[in-house]
UniProtKB/Swiss-Prot annotation:
Lineage: Eukaryota, Viridiplantae, Streptophyta, Embryophyta, Tracheophyta
UniProt gene name: TUBA5
Organism of provenance: Arabidopsis thaliana (Mouse-ear cress)
Name under which the protein is recorded: Tubulin alpha-5 chain
InterPro entries recorded: Alpha_tubulin (IPR002452), Beta-tubulin_BS (IPR013838), Tub_FtsZ_C (IPR008280), Tubulin (IPR000217), Tubulin/FtsZ-like_C (IPR037103), Tubulin/FtsZ_2-layer-sand-dom (IPR018316), Tubulin/FtsZ_GTPase_sf (IPR036525), Tubulin_C (IPR023123)
Binding-site positions, Mg(2+): E71
Record's miscellaneous remark: There are six genes coding for alpha-tubulin. The sequences coded by genes 3 and 5 are identical.
Family affiliation: Belongs to the tubulin family.
Compositionally biased intervals (Acidic residues): 431-450
The reaction(s) this protein catalyses: GTP + H2O = GDP + phosphate + H(+)
Molecular functions per Gene Ontology: GTP binding; hydrolase activity; metal ion binding; structural constituent of cytoskeleton
Classification via Pfam families: Tubulin, Tubulin_C
Transmembrane segments: none
Length: 450
């Protein structure tokens, strides 16, 4: 089996995790108590969904996941919520005091005390796997736990499980909407370690997802639940081929191979289509070309970043539902002829497609309509640098005055770490610039042959 362990860190990671596991359970027909009436082979671990769930002898399905937070309130909601019987109590780890939006507390003082316990739980889950494939890590980099403890855990996972893939789903600070004053510090410090210790990081940002909810789902005032349900659809689409048998399966390591041209250039944009409310879905056909065009629209990007300002290096299109390869090839062919979707000149093919016949599932009473087919795109575009330059700019404004720095130094950080992390990000922006730059003069006429 190719198992995957999910690690949810901090409030954002846990709440996204709740939505994801709720959706997985619905997709597989697993009840909130972990029983699965449709599973005829009790205790036999050869079903495809066993990548994400382990089965007990009694036929109960337990998520291969760990939830960690430095303060108990959010995890207590899981402990008392609908799915309280689904998780093993040892998988829900909470501390006593929170990281107070401070990277240094999450990484050095408070986080240090809990990290060994987390790794111990992860080790137990890993020992339970026959062929561990990798980790999905969920966190936000604006707060203290997600950024600090998130980085610490990733660093330790690199040491303990060097060769295993680590995919991060990371919520980055939005341009306008801010939840903490020190977000720029936490994000820069945390990205510094994401660069080193994740293989693929998918950037999400709340503002972009708010706009999608408002525009496409007609929700006037979206809540975090609305946002998380949309995020969970993306994560579910990425992992369908690991959990169901499909026509063209995409493995977790395949994402890496196809999307990451250079180790540092691994920050992805994601988009999903159709995002549509039940009232509208009834009147639209939503064919393969339509949804394929939709995922390339700047407005459907899940991070505030305009792909037209950059060039694509690679895209991964994951279709699910009633889709045949012929339709996909035609749709991709159309996209290639579009002048708005530009690829770098050194990557002429640029598309990786996966198809899975399992149609998308929706949460009952949720906002999304039940549709026959959907597509999720993860793309590597040089425009992602916009996200970093925005945060770097805010970082510089604060750091020039050394504002709030004493809180970090007081928790045992050195000021040098700030400048080191900031220089690393400056280098990253430069990397993106170089990757997007045109090739030599002699290559100009070669770009047209595909």
């Amino acid at each position: 089996m190719r198992e995957i362990i999910s690690i949810h860190i901090g409030q954002a990671g846990i709440q996204v995790g709740n939505s994801c596991w709720e959706l997985y359970c619905l997709e597989h027909g697993i009840q909130p108590d972990g029983m699965m009436p449709s599973d005829t082979t009790v205790g036999v671990a050869h079903d495809a969904f066993n990548t994400f769930f382990s089965e007990t002898g009694a036929g109960k399905h337990v998520p291969r996941a760990v939830f960690v937070d430095l303060e108990p309130t959010v995890i207590d909601e899981v402990r008392t919520g609908t799915y309280r019987q689904l998780f093993h109590p040892e998988q829900l780890i909470s501390g006593k005091e929170d990281a107070a939006n401070n990277f240094a507390r999450g990484h050095y003082t408070v986080g240090k005390e809990i990290v060994d316990l987390c790794l111990d739980r992860v080790r137990k889950l890993a020992d339970n796997c026959t062929g561990l494939q990798g980790f999905l890590v969920f966190n936000a980099v604006g707060g203290g736990t997600g950024s600090g403890l998130g980085s610490l855990l990733l660093e330790r996972l690199s040491v303990d499980y060097g060769k295993k893939s680590k995919l991060g789903f990371t919520i980055y600070p939005s341009p306008q909407v801010s939840t903490a004053v020190v977000e720029p510090y936490n994000s820069v410090l945390s990205t510094h370690s994401l660069l080193e210790h994740t293989d693929v990081a998918v950037l999400l940002d709340n503002e972009a997802i708010y706009d999608i909810c408002r525009r496409s789902l007609d929700i006037e005032r979206p809540t975090y639940t609305n946002l998380n349900r949309l995020i969970s659809q993306i994560i579910s689409s990425l992992t369908t081929s690991l959990r169901f048998d499909g026509a063209i399966n995409v493995d977790i390591t395949e994402f890496q191979t196809n999307l990451v041209p250079y180790p540092r250039i691994h920050f992805m944009l994601s988009s999903y289509a159709p995002v549509i409310s039940a009232a509208k879905a009834y009147h639209e056909q939503l064919s393969v070309p339509e949804i394929t065009n939709a995922v390339f629209e700047p407005a459907s990007m899940m991070a505030k970043c305009d792909p037209r300002h950059g060039k694509y290096m690679a895209c991964c299109l994951m279709y699910r539902g009633d889709v045949v390869p012929k339709d996909v090839n035609a749709a991709v062919g159309t996209i290639k002829t579009k002048r708005t979707v530009q690829f770098v000149d050194w990557c002429p093919t640029g598309f990786k497609c996966g198809i899975n016949y399992q149609p998308p599932t929706v949460v009952p009473g949720g906002d999304l309509a039940k549709v026959q087919r959907a597509v999720c795109m993860i793309s590597n575009n040089t425009a992602v640098a916009e996200v970093f330059s925005r945060i770097d700019h805010k970082f510089d404004l604060m750091y020039a005055k050394r504002a709030f720095v004493h809180w970090y130094v007081g928790e045992g950080m050195e000021e040098g770490e700030f400048s080191e992390a900031r220089e690393d990000l400056a280098a990253l922006e430069k990397d993106y610039e170089e990757v997007g730059a045109e090739g030599g003069d002699d290559e100009e006429d070669e770009g047209e042959d595909y």
